[in-house]
Amino acid sequence: MSDCHPVLLPEGPFSREQAVAVTTAYRNVLIEDDQGTHFRLVIRNAEGQLRWRCWNFEPDAGKQLNSYLASEGILRQ
């Protein structure tokens, strides 16, 4: 059994620090379209296909991404 625990985002907008914590915890979550102050957090499946993406400033970005992290997230070992 793995000692890895899921890392989730707040339900609303999220910071770069929070996004980096998620990308560090999951193999298939990436920061893309980085504009400095805003960026997208992207979840891809094992084949590399896009599953979901949200801008960090969207009102319910974390809530949407957390749902996909629970079903599609691949935790690092």
Swiss-Prot record:
Name of one Pfam family that matches: DUF905
Residue spans crossing the bilayer: none
InterPro entries, sorted: DUF905 (IPR009253), YkfF-like_sf (IPR038612)
Sequence similarity: Belongs to the UPF0401 family.
Name of the protein in question: UPF0401 protein c4569
Organism of derivation: Escherichia coli O6:H1 (strain CFT073 / ATCC 700928 / UPEC)
